[in-house]
Regions:
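Bacterial N-terminal signal peptides
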Residues: 8-18
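Gly/Gly-Pro-rich "capping" loops immediately C-terminal to redox-active cysteine motifs
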Residues: 31, 43-73, 82-87
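Conserved hydrophobic/aromatic "anchor" residues
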Residues: 34, 71, 99-100
C-alpha cells in the first residue's frame, strides 16, 4: 500500500512537471501573439514583410530570446523593436521564440 502510493506520487509529480514544461514553451500561444504584434514586419511564417526587417524563421530559440530581451532592456536598440519588446513578458518571449524557431526553412544556393 505504502509502495503503491509512493509510486502514485512519483507519477503525479512527473505529470505535473511535464505540464509545467508545456506551459513554459507554448508555440501556439506564440503564434497567436505573432499575429497580433509581429506579422506586419516579420510575417506569421517568419519571412520578413518589409525590407528592413530580418527573417526570423528557423532562427534558434536561444538567439531569438536573447535578442528580444536585449531590445527590452535597452542593450540593443532599434526604433521599432525597442517599442515592441517593452510590451513582452518573459513567458511571451519564450513562446514567440518557440514559434519562430519551430518553422522549418530550406536554403537554395546558386552554383
Ligand atoms: C514595425 C515593424 C516590426 C514589428 C511589428 C516587429 N519587429 Fe522585430 N524587427 C524589426 C526590425 C526593423 C528589426 C531589425 C532591427 C535592427 O536593425 O537592429 C527587427 C528585429 C527583430 C529581431 C532580431 C533579429 C536578428 O536577426 O537579430 C527579433 C528577434 C525580432 N525582431 C522579433 C520580433 C517579434 C517577436 C515581434 C513581435 C512581438 C517583432 N519583432 C515585431 C521590425 C519589427
Amino acid at each position: 500500500m505504502y509502495r503503491h502510493s509512493f509510486l502514485g506520487l512519483i507519477m503525479t509529480s512527473l505529470a505535473l512537471s511535464a505540464m509545467t514544461v508545456a506551459a513554459y514553451a507554448d508555440p501556439a500561444a506564440g503564434k497567436a501573439l505573432v499575429k497580433q504584434k509581429c506579422q506586419t514586419c516579420h510575417g506569421v511564417d517568419g519571412i520578413a514583410k518589409i525590407p528592413i526587417a530580418p527573417h526570423l524563421a528557423g532562427e534558434s530559440q536561444i538567439y531569438l530570446e536573447t535578442q528580444l530581451k536585449a531590445f527590452r532592456s535597452g542593450k540593443r536598440e532599434n526604433e521599432m523593436m525597442s517599442v515592441v519588446a517593452q510590451t513582452l513578458t518573459d513567458e511571451e518571449i519564450t513562446n514567440l521564440a518557440e514559434w519562430y524557431s519551430s518553422i522549418t526553412i530550406t536554403a537554395k544556393v546558386l552554383e
